[in-house]
Amino acid sequence: MRFSNLVTALTALLGAQAAAAVGDERDQLVKRASLTQVQNFGDNPSGIKMFLYVPDNLPENPAVVLVLHACAWTAEAFFGTTRYGQLADEHGIVLVFGQTPNDGDCWDVSSDQTLTHDGGGDSTGLANMVRYALDEYNGDPSRVFVTGESSGAMMTQVMAAVYPDLFAAASEFSGEPAGCFYTGTVRGWNSDCAGGQVQRTAEEWAATVRDMYPGYDGEYPRMQVFHGDVDTILHINSFNESVKEWSGIFGYDGTPLETLENNPGASLTKYIYGDRLQGIWGHGIGHVVPTNETEALTWFGIL
């Protein structure tokens, strides 16, 4: 498996998800206006693109949500196949969509730059997008969140690790633990990580996270992890290793305190490890677990 295989799989997924958005068991998708591109939002060393969706009914001090696409997707495509626009209109949320220029439209989750606080990679540009939105719309700095699918899910975990002071919570769909995909190169493919062969203790994973922001001693964002049990793109061990990583950060022992069947929906089981960590296991679901916007925003405390 290489990025080319991942891109091919996600291109097919994009078509299927777009078709499903026309009419499925979820609330009917209502077409929203297009995103607005922001050209100058601060330091942007890797040349990523920023797009905004700002509802007309914006309250004072709105929440800000960073949304990150999968490989082979664009910001506009992801926006058009999710309900985030509808929910932003209903609840007064500023949506920030990033878009990477990397080959295959995959986020850099593997280089030293992106895995270092203000290190000059994709993560630096994304952090500055969020800061721009906070300043421009007087956003509430205590209600800043990040979510994404696949490559965007990997970057979601990276952002939570590299910029823990910026985000209150994260929700990722079919990603990898922060730092698992490290190669030292931009957009490097880590076969060991993708194949489920990178296995560490909770303490080792926690040290990996803390090394991304040396000297930081504050809280880390609450984490919600989705993964499917027949994922052949990113091994199902990714779920267990992600749970270990964030259990190590939060001081949990990795044993669920509560197990909820068919929650938040059919074929899903929710494991609650503490008030700062949830894992949601998709039975018979491959890559990726479809974005559940309502569940993510509920985890964020917006709904």
Regions found by a protein language model. Name each.
Residues 100, 171-180:
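Active-site nucleophile loop of the alpha/beta-hydrolase fold
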Residues 113-137, 158:
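Alpha/beta-hydrolase active-site loop
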